[in-house]
Amino acid sequence: MDLADILTKAQIVPDLRATNRWEAIDELIENLVGTGKIQPGDRDAVIAAVKKRETSMSTGIGFGIGIPHASTDLIYEVVGALGRSRQGVNFDALDNQPVKLAMLFLVPQGQFQKHLHTLANIAKLLHKAEFREALEKAGSADAMLDAIREFGKR
């Protein structure tokens, strides 16, 4: 599953307020609740699932990228939210650099292959310096989504 298949403009947060990975996860999950991708009553359970995964090993993979993710039986399709932080978020990343782009995604429980495929596609796209630069320079969620669509075709 490609990034453009997961995101809408409403699921892009161009100015994350978070200062650490836990706040970033909360903010992105709150976005998914606000956009109707997660039921309000499931919010805490989804946060717990993502934080459990994040506690086992940071998803700050370097190059200013964080990809918090989890599997849960509370959703029926892959959902996600992308956040951008201009100042950077402490994610305890592998390279000790702050995360500027955080892509949170959730996969339905039991869909291991889809989980791996989605994670690989997101990581591959975000590792492209030109793509990260386009997202960082974009002036709005619309412009960020345009960049996602453009680079996703390449």
Placement of each model-derived feature along the sequence:
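Cytosolic covalent-transfer regions centered on His/Cys nucleophiles
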Residues: 1-154
